[in-house]
Regions:
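His/Glu-based metal-binding/catalytic segments typifying zinc-dependent metallopeptidases
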Residues: 1-53, 209-264
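Short beta-strand/turn micro-motifs at beta-sheet edges
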Residues: 17-21, 71-75, 169-172, 224-229, ...
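M16 family metallopeptidases and their MPP-like homologs
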Residues: 24-107, 117-161, 178-186, 234-245, ...
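Non-catalytic, conformational "gating/processing" segments within enzyme and secreted inhibitor domains
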Residues: 139, 143, 165-201
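Glycine-centered hinge/linker elements that transmit conformational signals in sensory
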Residues: 197-211
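C-terminal, active-site-flanking charged/polar segments
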Residues: 203-206, 261-262, 312-315
C-alpha cells in the first residue's frame, strides 16, 4: 500500500488514507481511535473500559455471524490511548456496520443481568492470573513496575468491586461527551470513500482536538531486585536490562543484540546446562523504551543460581561478540531486517 496520506479539511479529526488498489479487490481495513486526554491509563479507567468493552461486544454478538456472511468483521479494543474500533472486509459494507458499532459503543443500555455475568467473568479472569506460571507472573510484575498503565490483578479486582451498572453508564457518558478522533483507512478505497467515512464519524461524535495519552515509563536507576512469593514448586527468573534512552537507535541496537544472543542463551542454559524448560532471551519494548529481557523457569535450580548463570552467560557473550567476524555480524543484521 502507499504511505498514509492525511485527508484535507477534517477539522479537529485526524484521518489518514493508505490506498492500495494493486489487487483490485474491494476490501479495506479501518481503525478508529476515540481518545480522551487521560486515556485509559488509571486503574479506574482501565477496569471500566475493559468491562464496558465486554458488554458492548456481548450485545453485538448477534451481529457477528451476519457480518461474517456479508464479508466484514469488527473488533473493539481498549489500548492505553482510548477505545479503538477496527473493521475489515468489503469496503462497501463497512459504513453500515461502523454506524451500528458506534451507536452501541456510545449509548449501550446496560442490561443488569448481563452486567453481573460479565463482571463475574472478568473477576474470574483476574483471579486466574494468580495461577499463571511463575515466569509469566514475573514478567507481569516487570511490566507493572515499568508501565504506569499496567496494574496488578489485586488493584483491578478492588476497583472492579466498586463498579455498578449506573456507575459504568455515567463513566461511559462522560468519556464520549467529547473525544479526539484519529482514523486510518487502508485498502482499496479512494479519497471520496474515505471522506464519506470521515463525515460519518463527524456526524456521530462530538470531536475535539486531543493529544494522545501515553503511560509513564519508569527509568530504572541502578539494580533493582524483587523477590515474589509464588505458590509453585519451580523457581523462575525474569532479568531485564533497560536501554539508556528510548531513541530508535538504542532500540535498534538492543533488538539486534537480542537477535544475536537469544539462540545462544537457549542453547547454553536449556540444551547444555538443562537448567529449565522455559528459557528465552528477547527484546521487550514498553512504549518506545527498549531493552533486553531474559526469562527462565526451572524445576531443579533456585532463582539465585539462575541469576548467576545468566550473568556468567552475558560475560561470555561480551567476548564472543568482540570476536565476531564482519560477515557473521552482517548476516545477523540481515536476518533481523528480514523479520521486521
Amino acid at each position: 500500500s502507499n504511505a498514509p496520506e492525511a485527508l484535507p479539511d477534517t477539522g479537529p479529526m485526524a484521518f489518514y488514507l493508505a490506498a492500495d488498489t494493486e489487487f483490485g479487490v474491494p476490501r479495506a481495513m479501518l481503525h478508529v481511535s476515540l481518545r480522551r486526554p487521560d486515556g485509559l491509563i488509571s486503574v479506574a479507567d482501565s477496569v471500566r473500559a475493559r468491562l464496558y468493552r465486554n458488554l458492548v461486544e456481548d450485545d453485538l454478538n448477534a451481529l457477528s455471524y451476519p457480518a461474517l456472511l456479508a464479508g466484514v468483521s469488527y473488533g473493539i479494543s481498549t489500548p492505553d490511548r482510548g477505545f479503538r474500533i477496527s473493521l475489515g472486509g468489503y469496503q462497501d459494507k463497512q459504513s453500515e456496520l461502523l454506524q451500528v458499532v458506534l451507536d452501541r459503543l456510545t449509548s449501550l443500555t446496560i442490561n443488569p443481568d448481563r452486567f453481573l455475568v460479565l463482571k463475574t467473568e472478568l473477576e474470574n479472569s483476574l483471579q486466574d492470573s494468580f495461577k499463571n506460571r511463575p515466569f509469566q507472573q514475573g514478567f507481569d510484575r516487570l511490566r507493572q513496575n515499568i508501565l504506569s498503565s499496567s496494574w496488578p490483578a489485586t488493584d483491578q479486582l478492588a476497583e472492579l468491586a466498586t463498579v455498578t451498572p449506573e456507575d459504568l453508564s455515567l463513566w461511559r457518558d462522560a468519556y464520549f461527551e467529547q473525544v479526539g478522533v484519529e482514523a486510518l483507512a487502508v485498502g482499496n478505497l479512494d479519497m471520496a470513500a474515505a471522506q464519506r467515512i470521515q463525515a460519518q464519524l463527524a456526524n456521530s461524535l462530538v470531536i475535539t482536538p486531543t493529544a494522545a495519552a501515553a503511560p509513564t515509563v519508569t527509568q530504572i536507576d541502578g539494580p533493582v531486585t524483587e523477590v515474589m512469593d509464588i505458590d509453585h514448586n519451580d523457581a523462575s527468573l525474569v532479568f531485564y536490562l533497560q536501554n539508556k534512552d528510548d531513541t530508535l537507535l538504542e532500540t535498534a541496537k538492543s533488538n539486534l543484540l537480542g537477535h544475536i544472543i537469544a539462540p545462544e542463551y537457549f542453547s547454553s542454559l536449556r540444551t547444555e546446562q538443562q537448567l529449565g524448560y522455559v528459557v528465552s532471551a528477547f527484546s521487550p519494548e514498553f512504549e518506545q523504551q527498549g531493552g533486553l529481557g531474559f526469562v527462565i523457569q526451572s524445576p531443579s535450580a533456585p532463582a539465585a543460581a539462575l541469576h548467576q548463570k545468566t550473568l556468567e552467560f552475558l560475560a561470555g557473550e561480551v567476548t564472543r561478540l568482540a570476536d565476531m567476524s564482519a560477515e557473521d555480524y552482517a548476516q545477523n543484521q540481515e536476518g533481523l531486517i528480514a523479520q521486521v
